A protein has these predicted regions:
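Solvent-exposed, charged helical/coil patches
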Residues: 1-68, 180-183, 187-190, 194
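Mg2+/Mn2+-dependent nuclease catalytic core
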Residues: 113-129
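Active-site metal-binding core of divalent-cation-utilizing nuclease and nuclease-like domains
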Residues: 44-100
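Conserved catalytic cores of phosphodiester-cleaving nucleases, focusing on short active-site segments
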Residues: 89-91, 102-108, 126
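Well-ordered, non-membrane alpha-helical segments in soluble/globular domains
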Residues: 26-33, 116-121, 151
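Basic, glycine-rich
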Residues: 98-102, 128-194
Length: 194
């Protein structure tokens, strides 16, 4: 303690102490908790802290798939990304090396409402690299999992009458979209991982 006394910082209370240096926001911490909770409803799902080399993150096992989820990843020209971006998380596939890593952003309205154009440009640059998939989750996406709320899913068919959906999807060999129509963005992500 004496050797480090010049580095000691006074704080008002313990709430001022960051619990995990791996996440930069409360929403990111909630995302981890929501991922663990949603995973409990699945067979063969695990999310636990782990080191990969010198990097701290989480090991995720979902069915036969394995991922290392790394927080706070800078994506730039080295990754083929033309506009610098700092991803909240990247899920790096460990088993299926042909699978693209999934870049995850957790976007709370308070911090992103004035930068939608910038966020969109960054994410489009990540997609344009051809190296990654991009997933965005809102505060509500995460909070609904934590509160076990069912959500009104997006209308993937833009008002198309139900009786026309199956023939339409059959024509384009996309029947699996029928299963997705009643899921939230968070559920899509977990199912994608599984």
């Amino acid at each position: 303690i004496r050797e480090q006394q010049d580095n000691i910082i006074a704080i008002d209370n313990l709430r001022a102490v960051t619990i995990s240096p791996l996440v930069e926001s409360e929403l990111e911490a909630r995302f981890i908790e929501a991922l663990k909770r949603m995973g409990k409803s699945l067979e063969n799902f695990e999310c636990r802290p782990e080191f990969k080399g010198t990097k701290a993150g989480w090991f995720i096992r979902s069915g036969e798939h394995r991922y290392f989820m790394e927080p706070q990843v800078d994506l730039n020209a080295e990754h083929g990304v033309s506009i610098f971006s700092r991803a909240d998380f990247v899920l790096w596939p460990l088993v299926n090396k042909a699978a693209k890593p999934i870049v995850i952003f957790t976007d709370g309205f308070q911090y992103h409402k004035d930068r939608v154009d910038r966020d969109s440009a960054q994410r489009l640059a990540i997609v344009a690299s051809g190296e990654f998939l991009v997933w965005s989750l809102s505060y509500d996406d995460v909070q609904n999992v934590l509160e076990s709320k069912s959500v009104e899913p997006l209308d993937l068919f833009f008002g198309m009458p139900k009786e026309k959906r199956q023939p339409f999807l059959t024509k384009f060999q996309s029947l699996e979209l029928l299963e997705l129509q009643n899921q939230s963005s968070f559920q899509y992500l977990v199912n994608w991982l599984h």
